Structure formats: structure tokens, C-alpha cells
Amino acid sequence: MRKLVVGSRRSKLALTQSRQFIERLKKVEPDLDIEIKEIVTKGDRIVDKQLSKVGGKGLFVKEIQQELFDHEIDMAIHSLKDVPSELPDGLTLGCIPDREIPLDAFISKNHVQLADLPDGSIVGTSSLRRGAQILAKYPNLEIKWIRGNIDTRLSKLETEDYDAIILAAAGLRRMGWSDDIVTEYLDPELLVPAIGQGALGIECRSDDTELLDLLSKVHNQEVAECVTAERTFLKEMNGSCQVPIGGYATIDDNGRLTFTGLIMSPDGKQRFEQTATGNDPVELGKEVSDILKEQGAKEIIDALNEES
């Protein structure tokens, strides 16, 4: 196997995820020679704006994909929730490895549970999806935008006027944070996760058969089927970071999938949600999207995409 160059965002979490995946690869191919190339994306450079107000898709992947096309890197290790549902021609997801916990983590001052927060409490999140779902259930709370890496957000919780923050549990786990800092993990029935949350997507060139053969050895087919249902729903709904959209699939021992798709208005006042089961992940994602479109969810998405 030739020497491989892995493209990664420069954030601590992205680099940690990349190193952990390389370790996983080396368990099946111990003699691999791999280096990481750090790449700064548009999403990384935007630190003073809410990403939902920037517009566009692929804010954290486009520059990395260009490096693949230019043969500067051989593969890219993405948080799958950052990857648009349609990839450019010539690129493919070479594998979907094991998935970390897909839930959202609620972290509050003095470990006060979400249900016990006083009216007017300020909850920090960078996600329209989280904000809309919290407001729907707890309209007397205030949602306040927060950006930065995990360390920065935890610091802001301590030093600024936030009473709580919500983060992806997967990032906390991968960065080695103890469960002790988490007040509670939020059940998907309360907070439907983001599409692909907790999963990684390993992107490479479609014609790189040598690398694709290697990646197949660390591919998790069950996770791939779950995220395929989720990403099909995202594609069919034309979702983006301007839209409060969620989707979460599970698979049972018989290979049967259960998928919940969610579309909301940013203020939490309109909610479209549907759960369905099936054996074909693509058909399942389409089925749920068709139902939500019939209910009127498409109007929310079209309006939000026009605003961006």
C-alpha cells in the first residue's frame, strides 16, 4: 500500500477523530504509512456569524474535497453531519466506520436538569435544530447562539450568562471528556439528533480501488444503512443548516430499520415529525420525506432557503 495522506480540519476534535480512525486502520493494516494534512475550511474561518445565516452547503468540506480532486490528499475524515447529502461526481464515501453515541448532551450549571430550569434560563447552542426543539417543549427558556470548540463552549458556560449548553455527545466522548460533566443525555423523543450525528464519513476518489479495498475492512454496514436512511431524508427535503432538520435511524437484529424524520420552524411553533419502519434505507428516507411534504413541511424549508 502506498503512503496515504489524510485531509482533516484543523480543529482539535477533527484531528482527534482523524487520529482515532488512523489507529483503527492500522489494526487491520499495521504497516500503513499515513500522515495528516490540516485544512482550513470556510466554516472554520467564520467565527463571528451564526452558520445558519451564512448560507450554502458544505461549509466544512468543500476545501477538503478540492484537495481530493487535486490529489493533494487521498482521503478525508469528516463528521458525517457536516457532509451534504450529495457528493461531487468523482468522490464517494469509501466507508462508514463504527458510530459514536448520536445523542445530544445537556450540560448545565450546578447540574440542573433541563425540565427543572427556571423560566428565562439561557441555553446556548449553535444549532437551529436544537434551539427549535427546546423552544417547542420549553417556550419560556431563551436560546442564545454560541460558537467555538468544546473547550470554548464549556468555558463560556462558566464565565458568561449561559445557564446551560447543548453539545453533541459524540464530540465529548471522542475528546475524552468524562460523563460526569454531562447533566443528562437527551432522549431522541425530546431532541431528534442531527442527520448523521455521531457518525464519520471517509471520503475518497471513486476510482481509488486500492484505498477503497482497504476502507472496506473497517466499514460498518449497519451504521451505513442507518445513515443512508437519514441522508436520503436530508436530500429529499433539500435540508441545509438554514433549516431545523433532524433524523435518526436504528436497526434491529433482523436488519429492520426504524427512522424518525423531523422538520421544524426556527421558533419551535411548527413541528412536522414522522416515524416509519422498513428494510430499504433509501425507500424509508423517501417515505418519511413524502409524508412530511404532504403535511406542509416543504413550505418551511423553501421559505428558509429563500431567506439565506
UniProtKB/Swiss-Prot annotation:
Q: What is this protein called?
A: Porphobilinogen deaminase
Show the Pfam families listed in the entry. Answer: Porphobil_deam (PF01379), Porphobil_deamC (PF03900)
Pathway where this protein functions: Porphyrin-containing compound metabolism; protoporphyrin-IX biosynthesis; coproporphyrinogen-III from 5-aminolevulinate: step 2/4
Q: Which CDD domains match?
A: PBP2_EcHMBS_like
Kindly give any further remark recorded in the entry: The porphobilinogen subunits are added to the dipyrromethane group.
| Cited function | Tetrapolymerization of the monopyrrole PBG into the hydroxymethylbilane pre-uroporphyrinogen in several discrete steps.
Q: Which reaction does it catalyse?
A: 4 porphobilinogen + H2O = hydroxymethylbilane + 4 NH4(+)
The UniProt family comment states: Belongs to the HMBS family.
Q: Name one GO biological process term.
A: protoporphyrinogen IX biosynthetic process
User: Which residues are recorded with the post-translational modification S-(dipyrrolylmethanemethyl)cysteine?
Assistant: 241
